Amino acid sequence: MSGPVPSRARVYTDVNTHRPRDYWDYESHVVEWGNQDDYQLVRKLGRGKYSEVFEAINITNNEKVVVKILKPVKKKKIKREIKILENLRGGPNIITLADIVKDPVSRTPALVFEHVNNTDFKQLYQTLTDYDIRFYMYEILKALDYCHSMGIMHRDVKPHNVMIDHEHRKLRLIDWGLAEFYHPGQEYNVRVASRYFKGPELLVDYQMYDYSLDMWSLGCMLASMIFRKEPFFHGHDNYDQLVRIAKVLGTEDLYDYIDKYNIELDPRFNDILGRHSRKRWERFVHSENQHLVSPEALDFLDKLLRYDHQTRLTAREAMDHPYFYPIVKDQSRMGGSNMPSGSSTPVSSASMMSGISTVPTPSALGSLAGSPVISATNTLGTPVAAAAGATQ
């Protein structure tokens, strides 16, 4: 049997082909290290698979920052994250990498980021209005269209990686640890993204995917927000994940997708997939979520959650969808800004990387900036005494 049919991104296909090699050749990247003594850790914010995250103070200017201390992984992966963050620095709603230092204790790299006053997404998502959802989805799309236009796929879009400072209506797309450069025809690792947000291409082991993977993940986020069902596709493992998707999108379109790309399905699916009809999106509407759902929301969702990655809306196409007309109208009226002028303060992250367990924040830590504890000598490797209650 011949292999799978190749696929190419519909947009930004050759971005990296036309860039100089040092733009995407992250393995050859030479990291410029900052001074770790500039930062004092205040409290632990959380931990994930690949890192531990702290709130810290930059003692040279007294500004709050977030420090992500990377766990020992391949140097290549660390360089990739750094190169991507440097390439994207200054882009709309992309978390700003402020510095790179070495943790003096572990000798592992630590990434220093702007600070985001984040609201826990599980609490926040339950309070958002229809307009809020449109607004924040549009802000995520700005970040995605930008990174895609720069030849980069995020590959881990999920609520944990979207920091929202709701008070200032500020959003940042964070955790670029799984992000990768797109090269047409390249086969990528399918062990990316988090289960509930994995696109069908990953679940059927199709490796020649592209930016459109991020659009599926965004669709999962949208569905969970408008239907108030978190997560929307709740699989117990990667195989069950595809079954959950098939129970909504139907098995007929799944088999069309498999046939189109000549994909060989894992035999484990034979006993679990069954036959399912395509469900109408309206069936997920009920009295508790109907105020968040509109015909244009369902049309938009339908154009994101497609098996065939080539038929999903691109980020730019998504921004032009009628669902966002009220947002576009307001932003053009306000000159493209999403808030009053003068509020360009940097955005605290409660979850600076994938799968992190959030740590409760003691209220006493609210205004540590001027406290004597901070001015005590506290280098990057040693959390301050006042923060002891915030560590796990």
Swiss-Prot record:
Enzyme Commission code(s) on record: 2.7.11.1
Compositionally biased spans, kind Low complexity: 337-354
Active site per the UniProt annotation: D156
Compartments (UniProt record): Nucleus
Family annotation (Gene3D superfamilies): Phosphorylase Kinase, domain 1, Transferase(Phosphotransferase) domain 1
Cellular component annotations (GO), alphabetically ordered: cytosol; nucleus; protein kinase CK2 complex
Family: Belongs to the protein kinase superfamily. Ser/Thr protein kinase family. CK2 subfamily.
Protein name: Casein kinase II subunit alpha
Source species of the chain: Xenopus laevis
Gene coding for it: csnk2a1
